């Protein structure tokens, strides 16, 4: 099926999917052996795109591939293969609310747990001690009580984030599917935020959950990284070979 497809599209999350979580987000890197596999798949003619919560430019610096498309900040940013970056419009009131929320988190002594991205403020507690996690969870709940209508609060694996409505991983996948209607598409992700992407896949698309433990999901397939992830990518290569 893959070999006969006129176009193939492999869409990938990064953190927790292709790269293990680390105490410092800036230290995250691909599992060993993943980069050459992706490069080989790309050389075979599969189009590769990334959909991530990270800023698009940050992810571009971590991926040793050329000519890939990146949706960053959960779809708020789009980095074209040519390097052109576009961002969704944000209302001034939304930006001000996010700025105030980020300041509140930092002022509470949790600047180390704060991640500010375009259209998003995230609180990370995966590597916090129990007492610190309790405090961060309480702070997230307090901030969430004052959510404006155009901002949503969302839990993810290891934290909580406040994100301007309108764009998410699902809208990114829907955009790709609309521009490549004949492509056989697979989406690989690990987190709750990836469920939007699984839902947005076309009927012929394959959703792949990549994580150590199974959870309720809309994905069609479950892989435990890194070994089963390697096997899946190698199988993709084999299926495409003439």
Segments and roles (model prediction):
Residues 113-129, 151-163:
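Charged, glycine-interspersed solvent-exposed loop segments at helix/strand-loop junctions
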Residues 16, 70, 123, 173, ...:
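Residue-level signal for inorganic ion chemistry
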Residues 54-73, 131-151:
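Substrate-recognition/cap helix-loop segment adjacent to the acidic, metal-dependent catalytic center
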Residues 29-117:
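Active-site phosphate-binding/coordination module
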């Amino acid at each position: 099926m893959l070999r006969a497809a006129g176009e193939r599209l492999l869409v990938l999350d990064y953190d927790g999917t292709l790269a293990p979580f680390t105490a410092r987000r800036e230290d995250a890197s691909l599992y060993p052996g993943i980069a050459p596999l992706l490069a080989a798949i790309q050389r075979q003619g599969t189009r590769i795109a990334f959909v991530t919560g990270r800023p698009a430019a940050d992810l571009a610096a971590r991926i040793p591939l050329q000519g890939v498309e990146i949706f960053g900040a959960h779809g708020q940013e789009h980095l074209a293969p040519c390097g052109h970056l576009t961002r969704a419009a944000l209302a001034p009131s939304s930006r001000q609310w996010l700025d105030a929320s980020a300041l509140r988190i930092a002022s509470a002594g949790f600047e180390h747990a704060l991640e500010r991205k375009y259209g998003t403020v995230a609180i990370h507690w995966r590597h916090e001690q129990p007492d610190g996690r309790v405090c961060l969870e309480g702070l997230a709940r307090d901030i969430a009580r004052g959510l404006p209508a155009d901002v949503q609060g969302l839990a993810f694996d290891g934290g909580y984030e406040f994100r301007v409505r309108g764009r998410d991983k699902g809208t990114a996948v829907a955009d790709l599917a609309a521009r490549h209607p004949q492509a056989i598409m697979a989406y690989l992700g690990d987190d709750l935020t990836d469920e939007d992407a699984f839902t947005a896949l076309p009927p012929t698309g394959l959703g792949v959950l990549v994580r150590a433990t199974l959870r309720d999901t809309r994905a069609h397939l479950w892989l435990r990284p890194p070994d089963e992830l390697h096997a899946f990518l190698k199988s993709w290569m084999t299926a495409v070979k003439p």
